[in-house]
Amino acid sequence: MSKLSFRARALDAAKPLPIYRGKDMPDLNDCVSINRAVPQMPTGMEKEEESEHHLQRAISAQQVFREKKESMVIPVPEAESNVNYYNRLYKGEFKQPKQFIHIQPFNLDNEQPDYDMDSEDETLLNRLNRKMEIKPLQFEIMIDRLEKASSNQLVTLQEAKLLLNEDDYLIKAVYDYWVRKRKNCRGPSLIPQIKQEKRDGSTNNDPYVAFRRRTEKMQTRKNRKNDEASYEKMLKLRREFSRAITILEMIKRREKTKRELLHLTLEVVEKRYHLGDYGGEILNEVKISRSEKELYATPATLHNGNHHKVQECKTKHPHHLSLKEEASDVVRQKKKYPKKPKAEALITSQQPTPETLPVINKSDIKQYDFHSSDEDEFPQVLSPVSEPEEENDPDGPCAFRRRAGCQYYAPRLDQANHSCENSELADLDKLRYRHCLTTLTVPRRCIGFARRRIGRGGRVIMDRISTEHDPVLKQIDPEMLNSFSSSSQTIDFSSNFSRTNASSKHCENRLSLSEILSNIRSCRLQCFQPRLLNLQDSDSEECTSRKPGQTVNNKRVSAASVALLNTSKNGISVTGGITEEQFQTHQQQLVQMQRQQLAQLQQKQQSQHSSQQTHPKAQGSSTSDCMSKTLDSASAHFAASAVVSAPVPSRSEVAKEQNTGHNNINGVVQPSGTSKTLYSTNMALSSSPGISAVQLVRTVGHTTTNHLIPALCTSSPQTLPMNNSCLTNAVHLNNVSVVSPVNVHINTRTSAPSPTALKLATVAASMDRVPKVTPSSAISSIARENHEPERLGLNGIAETTVAMEVT
């Protein structure tokens, strides 16, 4: 038993020894290998590498240490030898040199090319030598330069001419040969290269994986804590040391700065003492002269223990503001942290005078008071306490507050909106910023001072503003404003008048009601009231009031664009009409209907005339029947008035409306009366200024409930209304030839038809002598063109409505 195979163990007396019988006694070698053998050492390889051939041979060579040395094998890579191939390549003409190490002299010898010619190159060289002389070395240099200049992409012919300093014919011949040979060669280059790999384990081309160089080193000792936690602790320790070093460097720099500041302060004090500047006049003059040279004044701050701030320099810019911070009185003994005073803005910079120059100030005494670094005060950042004036600010937290250290420009008065406070700027932007006294029509009341502006969709928005005259303005009745006659007023919109604007809160005395009315009458106070355009001047004013590119929408007509005309005959009112094309189409349809009626009447008269000769008795009965089915004027009026029922203005209001006329207040036309215009969304004003259609509404005044009869004046094409006179003369109830339902939107709900109206409608429907008028008539087609549903007073009689003759 050798020492190498024996492992020493501590003897244990309590452990029983094994007892073997003679026939069961194992061999000594087997017993030693089982009990006392050294355990197999770990190979240090991965599991998939332990079965490799080279590793197993090395392990087996380690185990045969007791055998002869000849049987021990050191694993090495296999090497193959081919002597015949070697002798064929290298012939035995080798001569032993005199010395193996040959040192060439250090001279400028030409570098030998790495490219070696082969038999194919020699053939080309012999062919080229017939025309010109070229040496093999010269040919190798040319190929070598082309190879080294090319990587994956070959050089071009022009680049080859720059590389090779030879004849163009020679360069072209060699270049073409090199390109052809390079393409035929499947390798990366024509120059053979030795495989030189780094032995750091980065390449995996080694076939012997077991003997590769290990990039990751195995951890052999477990007692060192090189884990992540210890690494983080080391990083934290390094950061703390770096921070301590940085703090020491900053303290060192601060102390140097303080020492330099102390020396400079002593020099300034000595110079002032020699000059006799005990009051600081010369020092202030020097500061002012320096501030005039600078374009933007920058405050200079002394970084001492008291945090004293020098007064900032001032400039003479007309709209420039400088900020000045007062020196805080700090008590060093208690080390208090006082609140910094609020910065005050200086509107104008004044020149220093002997009266305003400071003689001795406590801050000047503390300016030269220094203390050591251990008494440095670190200013505590406190949240600003809201002051009473800030709490009372209407803007609240959004109020503008000046920041310390910032410079602001003074507001320019010529660009501010203070026309009401400054009389000189009262006329600036008067069309944009003026507010005038405003009166509304519905409801009729005075809303005070307001300003008009256009909102989304062309809607007019009133911006009201409160003044101290609001209690008086609420007492104004719009009828007072309507009583002013426009004929006796001379409207002047020049800027010479001192207008009272909406923001007249700052007026000294409150005006009375009579004074306000007198100001309105004399055009000293602007007054606005909405108006409705007349029919006679709507065409002329439409071109001037409408903006370029603005069109009249058929579905939305503003109240100002709907014409209103009152006539004195029969109480007939005319409201806004249809377009020119619709009017012409309607005229053609009416003419065609009249022709059809006349043709049918002539045919029936002929048939009646023939029947009168054969049946004289039947003639009288048929004549009486025809007369009974013909309605008179009063019956037609009563039947048509039962179709639509809506409230209309009273007679007193209509009379007042006719007698009042059109009034102007400050050049604005006032509406006449209190009647409301019927507003129809499916009717539009005519775009032609010369031709306009009208819609007639008959007002019946003798009944208990007023009624509106929609009809259309179509007596003849020559009775087209052009102005008020023509319209008044053209509107006659006896001229109405056709009555058809009109799509009129009435604000109030239509009442139910009376039984008498139903009977009259039934009789009219049973008349076979008069043709029916279907809903596809002219005015009904207008509603279909506007894509709106027909809203008739009598839905049940809409299909049976007939044209009636009025005698």
Curated annotation (Swiss-Prot):
Pfam families in the cross-refs: E_Pc_C, EPL1
Crosslinked positions (Glycyl lysine isopeptide (Lys-Gly) (interchain with G-Cter in SUMO2)): K135, K195, K324, K362
Keyword Transport included in the entry's annotation: no
InterPro entries per record: Enhancer_polycomb, Enhancer_polycomb-like_N, Enhancer_polycomb_C
One BP annotation, GO: regulation of transcription by RNA polymerase II
Composition bias type Low complexity, residue spans: 600-613
Protein name listed in UniProt: Enhancer of polycomb homolog 2
Function: May play a role in transcription or DNA repair.
Name of the gene this protein is made from: EPC2
Source organism, top-level taxon: Eukaryota
